[in-house]
Amino acid sequence: MSCPVIELTQQLIRRPSLSPDDAGCQALLIERLQAIGFTVERMDFADTQNFWAWRGQGETLAFAGHTDVVPPGDADRWINPPFEPTIRDGMLFGRGAADMKGSLAAMVVAAERFVAQHPNHTGRLAFLITSDEEASAHNGTVKVVEALMARNERLDYCLVGEPSSIEVVGDVVKNGRRGSLTCNLTIHGVQGHVAYPHLADNPVHRAAPFLNELVAIEWDQGNEFFPATSMQIANIQAGTGSNNVIPGELFVQFNFRFSTELTDEMIKAQVLALLEKHQLRYTVDWWLSGQPFLTARGKLVDAVVNAVEHYNEIKPQLLTTGGTSDGRFIARMGAQVVELGPVNATIHKINECVNAADLQLLARMYQRIMEQLVA
């Protein structure tokens, strides 16, 4: 199958860019963008490669994405080696095919076609690309955004190429994401012998009523755009492994995926009040990995919906479900942020794949979005 989008996707898949190693992917993208008149600024931080590229001036539409991929797992379980792209029955297989090298290829080819047709486009077209979205993400998009904000860069619209679709490309568009807040909680007791409980203080017993009440809380009921806030206990650890020792500490880690009905400070206050109510001795550490954000109907959402309806003849659902994405950092710039990408059914799995025709369709959609906003 000869197609510039498929060919570029295959070239990217052949580069085993395990986070945060870019493995030469960005050099390939930069070469293509510079050839059509983009100015490229590399913005590397520690072991992470990033670049910010732009062409033109005025209202800015940025395309954002990541070159890194998650590990392939057991390569012997793949129908072909994970970094050797293969097309079977119209499906392109390879690690990163859906998440998100196919989107990157579609973005770049769309930009090439757009610039060829609109060499003097009125707005500014930009790219924000990182090699660390899948791992810690500490030195990726967040650092680039901080640098851009420090010099008052303008970003009006941002299209993130994360695989948003469920069954066919464009059936779901993400116009927001929930916030994510993790609590690392240690309940302190006194270690002792199980035969002498009066000489010890069992933190597991002490914490049980607190945890019971915590999991029963209805944090909110969500709203028009967000499902209800969810709290899940992810890890819990106590004890020495011996059956005759009362543990001295209990560690509990729980995560909130929260809507715009709450703030992280409101959640923290409620958890701390509950700890005090149960008279627990504790230490607590919080990690806020992202605030919730929402892009209401406006120029970007309308342009994306128009592009999907034009090429796939379906009306996309606007959803805020799923995990976090780098869109949470870009939203800080005041930009309208929307995610549109391929079907996500196989992301992070053995035999990750994407419908090759979907990538061609995605490139056309991306180009139509450019034409509506910065032509």
Curated annotation (Swiss-Prot):
GO BP annotation list: diaminopimelate biosynthetic process; L-arginine biosynthetic process; lysine biosynthetic process via diaminopimelate
Positions annotated to bind Zn(2+) 1:
66, 99, 162
What EC number(s) has UniProt assigned to this enzyme? 3.5.1.18
Query: What does the entry comment about cofactor binding?
Result: Binds 2 Zn(2+) or Co(2+) ions per subunit.
Superkingdom of this entry's organism?
A: Bacteria
Active-site residues are: 68, 133 (proton acceptor)
UniProt keyword terms in alphabetical order: Amino-acid biosynthesis, Cobalt, Diaminopimelate biosynthesis, Hydrolase, Lysine biosynthesis, Metal-binding, Zinc
List the catalysed reactions. N-succinyl-(2S,6S)-2,6-diaminopimelate + H2O = (2S,6S)-2,6-diaminopimelate + succinate
Broad class of enzyme this protein falls into = hydrolase
Q: Which NCBIfam families match?
A: dapE_proteo, PRK13009.1
HAMAP family hit by this protein: DapE
Can you say what this protein is called? Answer: Succinyl-diaminopimelate desuccinylase
